[in-house]
């Protein structure tokens, strides 16, 4: 694992979906590096508040906000809370997502064809994984442009997951996220605002995984993304796609 020493003192970061899994790991890592971190939770504020309490022992801080990234007013409120810290936003991690469990609880063992999916569950995944990222990025980028700097980290998945049988709409939503990231990187070129992709590199122990996983499946620890997330907080380029399992190799 590469040694990533990052000083995030005086920085303000938003990590969506920061109450558990990958978001939790990134939020605590940023606070450990000195950042003021604001995390969102759409469904379980208690989890996010527990993460915030852990931040009390770190050089930085963690603040929990109940917010759904698909709701414009929630997004505005989340951004306003972050701006209360130091009047700016330096880093946005678009981590909040809805996985296949919202469409099919047993998606790993009993794949469901797309035509059998519930339309409302389908919409919820698309709204969170694509529209939510758009709303959050749209809300913070003007502030970053005014400051002449900023970093956006979009959390994605393996490309094989994007086209895997039974993984619709989750897989395709992440393919759309990656396409959006490349387009936005081009549009932000030369502004000082950078946008990149980060993924664990395999199935990860988060709330998105079904409870009875197939025998022999080993889950990655969410902490695996921490070195990459720290690196991207100070990114000076755009369009990178960091795969944690490969990037962490010595």
Each predicted region: which residue ranges?
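Catalytic Tyr-X3-Lys loop
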Residues: 98, 111-134, 153, 177
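Conserved mid-core segment of classical short-chain dehydrogenase/reductases
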Residues: 76, 99-123, 146, 166-169
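Alpha-helical segment proximal to the catalytic Tyr-Lys
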Residues: 142, 185-187
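C-terminal helical subdomain
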Residues: 190, 197-199, 214-250
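Active-site helix of classical SDR
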Residues: 137, 173
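Conserved glycine-rich cofactor-binding loop
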Residues: 19-20
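Conserved glycine-rich Rossmann-like NAD(P)H-binding loop of the short-chain dehydrogenase/reductase
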Residues: 33-50
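The beta1-alpha1 cofactor-binding region of Rossmann-like NAD(H)/NADP(H)-dependent oxidoreductases
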Residues: 45, 66-78, 119
């Amino acid at each position: 694992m590469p040694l990533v020493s990052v000083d995030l003192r005086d920085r303000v970061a938003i990590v969506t979906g920061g109450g558990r899994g990958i978001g939790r790991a990134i939020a605590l890592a940023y606070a450990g590096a000195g950042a003021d971190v604001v995390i969102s939770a759409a469904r379980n504020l208690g989890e996010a508040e527990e993460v915030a309490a852990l931040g009390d022992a770190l050089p930085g801080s963690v603040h929990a906000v109940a917010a759904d990234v698909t709701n414009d007013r929630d997004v505005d409120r989340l951004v306003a809370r972050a701006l209360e810290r130091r009047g700016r936003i330096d880093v946005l991690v678009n981590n909040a997502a809805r996985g296949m469990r919202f469409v099919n609880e047993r998606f790993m063992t009993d794949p469901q064809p797309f035509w059998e999916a519930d339309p409302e569950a389908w919409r919820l995944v698309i709204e969170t994984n694509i529209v939510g990222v758009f709303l959050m990025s749209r809300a913070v980028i003007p502030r970053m442009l005014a400051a002449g700097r900023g970093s956006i980290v979009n959390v994605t998945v393996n490309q094989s997951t994007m086209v895997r049988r039974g993984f619709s709409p989750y897989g395709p939503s992440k393919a759309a996220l990656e396409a959006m990231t490349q387009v936005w990187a081009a549009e932000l070129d030369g502004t000082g605002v950078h946008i990149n992709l980060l993924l664990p590199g395999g199935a990860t122990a988060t709330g998105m995984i079904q409870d009875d996983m197939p025998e022999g499946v080993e889950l990655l620890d969410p902490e695996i993304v921490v070195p990459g997330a720290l690196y991207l907080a100070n990114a000076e380029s755009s369009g990178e796609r960091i795969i944690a399992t490969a990037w962490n190799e010595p």
